[in-house]
């Protein structure tokens, strides 16, 4: 490896370790809290599932990164296809669980008198479950069609490396286009949640000012913490999606591919750290753990 690849390797390993530690920490804390209380809240269920999916996504990204850094001849096209399936599944659940978390914050925190909003708020758990199940059916249908066709192409041209390489490039570009189309929905929903939370916060501050009260009340702080979580998710998700699209179009350009994968890995690692710091329970456990480490 040259100097650039060594630098990318070090950064990737730091992100990989940080992301796994952060997500594993979330899983352990919520598991301990669940055993103590004998129940788990809806928010903790979503965050725990999100942490599990992000651990899987980090490992899938590491597999793709490893296949480009080291000799690609050691990787069969079937192994590459398998790692692609793992990435597609974990990426899908990471995206939609993050979107569902944004919706959860919106309906739990925002205050609107709209009849549809109030109806969805009353049925929130059922609404989120339906969204999760429908999105799951879509991803498995997508994987069934795309990967069966990809494996069939490669099997027909088993002995022709040149043709197989071209087919992989075509499949990568096609998958990138499908990725862009599929991710319009969760990105649009998350963006809508951000805008509605901002509007709700603005309306709340206006009411507080009208009644002559201060702006640092509990509802304002809850709005701000939710916005920090949702906005950070949206920005990191947009950055990650851009990296996936660029890497899909530049799969033969190894430096660009590795750079995009490394930047994209900050999404499942960085947002989990933001979740820990923005969640009162997780933050308290983290500070307690750090104090015990110092002793």
From Swiss-Prot:
It is found in: Membrane. Residues 1-5, 67-83, 147-177, 252-255 are extracellular. Keywords: G-protein coupled receptor, Glycoprotein, Membrane, Receptor, Sensory transduction, Taste, Transducer, Transmembrane, Transmembrane helix. It holds the Pfam family TAS2R. GO terms for biological process: detection of chemical stimulus involved in sensory perception of bitter taste. One of its GO terms (cellular component) is membrane. Its main location: membrane. Glycans are attached at residue 160. It is a multi-pass membrane protein. GO terms for molecular function: bitter taste receptor activity; G protein-coupled receptor activity. CDD domains: 7tm_TAS2R43-like (cd15027). The chain crosses the membrane at residues 6-26, 46-66, 84-104, 126-146, 178-198, 231-251, 256-276. Residues 27-45, 105-125, 199-230, 277-295 are cytoplasmic. InterPro entries: TAS2R (IPR007960). SUPFAM superfamilies: Family A G protein-coupled receptor-like. Several bitter taste receptors are expressed in a single taste receptor cell. Putative taste receptor which may play a role in the perception of bitterness. Belongs to the G-protein coupled receptor T2R family. This is Taste receptor type 2 member 120. It comes from Rattus norvegicus (Rat).
């Amino acid at each position: 490896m040259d100097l650039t690849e060594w630098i990318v390797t070090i950064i990737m390993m730091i992100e990989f370790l940080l992301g796994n530690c952060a997500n594993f920490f979330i899983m352990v804390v919520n598991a301990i809290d669940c055993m103590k209380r004998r129940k788990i809240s809806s928010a903790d269920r979503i965050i725990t599932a999100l942490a599990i999916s992000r651990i899987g996504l980090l490992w899938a990204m590491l597999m793709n990164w490893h296949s480009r850094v080291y000799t690609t001849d050691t990787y069969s096209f079937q192994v590459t296809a398998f790692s692609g399936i793992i990435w597609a599944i974990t990426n899908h659940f990471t995206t939609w669980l993050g979107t569902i978390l944004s919706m959860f914050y919106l309906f739990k925190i925002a205050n609107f008198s709209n009849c549809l909003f109030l109806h969805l708020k009353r049925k929130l758990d059922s609404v989120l479950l339906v969204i999760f199940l429908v999105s799951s059916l879509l991803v498995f249908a997508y994987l069934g069609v795309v990967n069966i066709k990809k494996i069939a192409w490669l099997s027909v041209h088993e002995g022709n490396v040149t043709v197989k390489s071209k087919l992989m490039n075509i499949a990568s570009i096609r998958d990138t286009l499908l990725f862009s189309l599929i991710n319009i929905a969760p990105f649009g929903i998350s963006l809508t949640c951000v805008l509605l939370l901002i509007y709700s916060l603005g309306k709340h501050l206006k009411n507080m000012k009208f009644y002559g009260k201060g702006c640092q009340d509990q509802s304002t702080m809850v709005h701000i913490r939710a916005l920090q979580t949702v906005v950070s998710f949206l920005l990191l998700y947009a950055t990650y999606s851009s990296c996936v699209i660029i890497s899909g179009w530049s799969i033969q350009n190894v430096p660009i591919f590795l750079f995009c994968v490394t930047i994209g890995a900050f999404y499942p690692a960085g947002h989990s750290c933001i979740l820990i710091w923005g969640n009162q329970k997780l933050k308290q456990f983290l500070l307690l753990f750090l104090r015990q480490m110092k002793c």
